[in-house]
Curated annotation (Swiss-Prot):
InterPro entries: Calcineurin-like_PHP_ApaH (IPR004843), LpxH-like (IPR043461), Metallo-depent_PP-like (IPR029052), UDP-diacylglucosamine_Hdrlase (IPR010138). Pathway: Glycolipid biosynthesis; lipid IV(A) biosynthesis; lipid IV(A) from (3R)-3-hydroxytetradecanoyl-[acyl-carrier-protein] and UDP-N-acetyl-alpha-D-glucosamine: step 4/6. This is UDP-2,3-diacylglucosamine hydrolase. The gene is lpxH. Binds 2 Mn(2+) ions per subunit in a binuclear metal center.
Amino acid sequence: MCTLFIADLHLSEHEPAITAGFLRFLQEQAIHANALYILGDFFDFWIGDDDPNPLHQRIAQALMALKNAGVPCYFIHGNRDFLIGSRFAKESGMTLLPQEKVLEIEQHRILILHGDTLCTDDDAYQRYRKKVHNKFIQRLFLLLPLTIRLRIAKKMRSRSQSSNQYKSEAIMDVNAQAVINTFKQFNTQWMIHGHTHRPAIHTVDIDGKPHYRGVLGAWHTEGSMFKVTSDKIELIQFPF
């Protein structure tokens, strides 16, 4: 048996192929796992659990079916879907996790997170992140009518895409010292995250000992997952 990790699907009604690929992944791969962990940016944006988007309902039903088949699903918020709350979690059968979580799987000790907190060189993004994760601001936003929330979300997304065009690749990637500090803070040999859309396994030397940072790819043209078994941790890219 295995444990699976995915991130950065950016599910949207405008990308039906990705949705179909994810549903096929649940039926053909996740169904055979011990557990499924989704490490953020599951949806392209999220304006509240009260959004009656049919896609959200379809995904919730598929995840609940997975849970009913004996495979639990766990979720860490990303920068696109940080407003997913207890209502959707209940409807989908997902368990919401904190922004960092240490797992003990067989002999592996693994830290999981979305990954945006590691990108400390991007000062503008970190300021934005601090604002939108403010609970008071979130409560105010969720009090707005859905139409206004949707308008704000689309405007923020457009602004983010425009801003990122002028940022260097290095700024939008993780900061090496932030990675080392995080490894030391949580005392793990492995870290798995998403966010940067740069699938790879990096070896990080800390005090003469190897540590491993696994990065999930985004589901743009193919699927990406980490598969953890008793004897290995592997990054797998696969067609939809």
